[in-house]
């Protein structure tokens, strides 16, 4: 079985310069979601029909799908015709590029029905409480499908039909190649409809089957930003429910946003307005949020992160982060560390049991075990041309309001006096003070 993705349309109601299918639903372009569903269903080769700003779709599917170009967007039937020279298998499945919630299991069921019945076409249908905008499935008195009529071409009686066409089909490739050139644009849109293949097949006595999907949300399309937001919410809701079934507590599933590739351990509690993105892995027994964003990071067990942003970092077990901390790419935090309020850490290692409690910037640094870094400490890592490393060894104590001008090394168990600006290394167990002496002028105020 080979597949065709219809991805040529502009999507006028999206009010965008981008093709509709490249808009993202929960971190992933719609057309990529459809492609992955096809591959997950066992489709061995995919042809994507592109048109409006085709290079944007090609960027996403390059190396994945064969690209067929529809220079003029003349309807779904014409798009399928454009793809036909690239289809080699006996059967083909055709899917719109704007159905991002579609499951591979649904496509598998459609393919199975098509192959087992030997039908020339099999249509995936669905019953909707509000079928407005969808093509209706018209059946005869015996329940056999006789045609699919689009909303704009339907009679008042046909508009009362609740069973709709999802726009997803399996076809016998040979007969489809024969029928597509016969389509006519005799409709309100003056387009060539793929749906018109069905009555032409029936006229020739060819078997047409249907299979009905139960979960209507899978086949929801996207025509505007409102629908895009609704489907995005659906993806996040599906992920949240799956995690809750696996032992994760989510205080308010409507206000958390967890990507599909995110892994979360049991007994973790997630508070509102928390974003877990990319390939993030969260351990067990953690407390995340509220108002926290974690992207492409690994978090250990029993760690608490609140009101903070963590991007491409690794955080160990029993770590406390926040509120208002920012861990930037390349940061690694060992077990038992405290990263407090208004602390920014960039491309640094913080050793086990160390503390950076307040108002500090730690960049391009290696911090050992059991180090205490006082409020207002800055690693001055950039000289205007290059970034330099700061090393703070085990047990060191850095006083508040200290500037460490890199490259610099603070030895084991050394102490740095508050208010110092250091430009030279500090030996082990030494006290370093680099500030002016205090002078009190008696009777200064008259």
Swiss-Prot record:
Cofactor: Mg(2+)
Keyword DNA-binding in record: no
Origin: domain of life: Bacteria
GO biological process: cell morphogenesis; cell wall organization; lipid A biosynthetic process; peptidoglycan biosynthetic process; regulation of cell shape; UDP-N-acetylglucosamine biosynthetic process
Co-factor remark: Binds 1 Mg(2+) ion per subunit.
Pfam family, any one: NTP_transferase
GO molecular function: glucosamine-1-phosphate N-acetyltransferase activity; magnesium ion binding; UDP-N-acetylglucosamine diphosphorylase activity
Region (Linker) residue spans: 226-246
Keyword Glycoprotein appears in the UniProt entry: no
Region (N-acetyltransferase): 247-446
Protein keywords: Acyltransferase, Cell shape, Cell wall biogenesis/degradation, Cytoplasm, Magnesium, Metal-binding, Multifunctional enzyme, Nucleotidyltransferase, Peptidoglycan synthesis, Repeat, Transferase
Binding site for Mg(2+): 98, 223
Binding positions for UDP-N-acetyl-alpha-D-glucosamine per the UniProt entry: 6-9, 20, 70, 75-76, 135, 150, 165, 223, 328, 346, 361, 372
EC number in record: 2.7.7.23, 2.3.1.157
Pathway: Nucleotide-sugar biosynthesis; UDP-N-acetyl-alpha-D-glucosamine biosynthesis; N-acetyl-alpha-D-glucosamine 1-phosphate from alpha-D-glucosamine 6-phosphate (route II): step 2/2; Nucleotide-sugar biosynthesis; UDP-N-acetyl-alpha-D-glucosamine biosynthesis; UDP-N-acetyl-alpha-D-glucosamine from N-acetyl-alpha-D-glucosamine 1-phosphate: step 1/1; Bacterial outer membrane biogenesis; LPS lipid A biosynthesis
Chemical reaction(s) catalysed: alpha-D-glucosamine 1-phosphate + acetyl-CoA = N-acetyl-alpha-D-glucosamine 1-phosphate + CoA + H(+); N-acetyl-alpha-D-glucosamine 1-phosphate + UTP + H(+) = UDP-N-acetyl-alpha-D-glucosamine + diphosphate
Annotated spans, Pyrophosphorylase: 1-225
Subcellular location: Cytoplasm
Active-site annotation: 358 (proton acceptor)
Database matches in CDD domains: GT2_GlmU_N_bac, LbH_GlmU_C
GO CC terms of this entry: cytoplasm; membrane
Task performed by this protein: Catalyzes the last two sequential reactions in the de novo biosynthetic pathway for UDP-N-acetylglucosamine (UDP-GlcNAc). The C-terminal domain catalyzes the transfer of acetyl group from acetyl coenzyme A to glucosamine-1-phosphate (GlcN-1-P) to produce N-acetylglucosamine-1-phosphate (GlcNAc-1-P), which is converted into UDP-GlcNAc by the transfer of uridine 5-monophosphate (from uridine 5-triphosphate), a reaction catalyzed by the N-terminal domain.
Assembly notes: Homotrimer.
Similarity-based family: In the N-terminal section; belongs to the N-acetylglucosamine-1-phosphate uridyltransferase family.
Annotated protein name in UniProt: Bifunctional protein GlmU
Species of origin: Carboxydothermus hydrogenoformans (strain ATCC BAA-161 / DSM 6008 / Z-2901)
């Amino acid at each position: 079985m080979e597949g065709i993705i219809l991805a040529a349309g502009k999507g006028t109601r999206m009010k965008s310069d981008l093709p509709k299918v490249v808009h993202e639903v929960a971190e992933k372009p719609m057309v990529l979601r459809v492609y992955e569903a096809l591959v997950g269903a066992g489709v061995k080769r995919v042809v994507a029909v592109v048109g409006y700003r085709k290079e944007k779709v090609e960027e996403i599917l390059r190396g994945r799908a064969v690209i067929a170009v529809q220079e003029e967007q003349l309807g779904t039937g014409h798009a399928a015709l454009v793809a036909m020279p690239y289809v080699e298998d006996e059967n083909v499945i055709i899917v719109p590029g704007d159905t991002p919630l579609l499951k591979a299991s649904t496509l598998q069921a459609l393919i199975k029905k098509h192959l087992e019945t030997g039908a020339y076409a099999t249509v995936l249908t669905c019953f909707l409480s509000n079928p407005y905008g969808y093509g209706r499935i018209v059946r005869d008195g015996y329940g056999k499908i006789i045609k699919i009529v689009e909303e704009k071409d339907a009679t008042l009686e046909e508009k009362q039909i609740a069973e709709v066409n999802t726009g997803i089909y399996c076809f016998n490739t040979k007969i489809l190649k024969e029928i597509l050139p016969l389509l006519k644009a005799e409709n309100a849109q003056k387009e060539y409809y793929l749906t018109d293949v069905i009555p032409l097949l029936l006229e020739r006595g060819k078997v047409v089957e249907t299979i009905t999907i139960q979960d209507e949300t899978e086949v929801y399309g996207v025509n505007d930003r409102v629908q895009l937001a609704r489907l995005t919410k659906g993806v996040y809701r599906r992920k949240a429910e799956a995690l809750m079934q696996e032992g994760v507590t989510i205080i308010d599933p409507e206000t958390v946003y967890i990507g599909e590739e995110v892994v979360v351990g049991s007994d973790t509690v997630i508070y509102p307005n928390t974003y877990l993105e990319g390939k993030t892995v969260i351990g067990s027994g953690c407390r995340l949020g509220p108002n926290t964003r974690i992207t492409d990071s690994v978090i250990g067990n029993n760690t608490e992160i609140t009101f903070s942003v963590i991007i491409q970092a690794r955080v160990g077990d029993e770590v406390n982060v926040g509120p208002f901390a920012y861990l930037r790419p390349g940061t690694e935090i060992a077990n038992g560390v405290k990263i407090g309020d208004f602390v920014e850490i960039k491309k640094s290692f913080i050793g086990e049991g160390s503390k950076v409690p307040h108002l500090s910037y730690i960049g391009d640094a290696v911090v050992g075990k059991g180090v205490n870094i006082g409020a207002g400490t800055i690693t001055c890592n950039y000289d205007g041309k290059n970034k330099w490393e700061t090393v703070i060894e085990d047990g060191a104590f850095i006083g508040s309001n200290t500037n460490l001008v890199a490259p610099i090394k603070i030895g084991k168990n050394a102490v740095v006096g508050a208010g110092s600006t250091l430009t030279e290394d500090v030996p082990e167990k030494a006290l370093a003070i680099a500030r002016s002496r205090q002078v009190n002028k008696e009777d200064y105020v008259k």
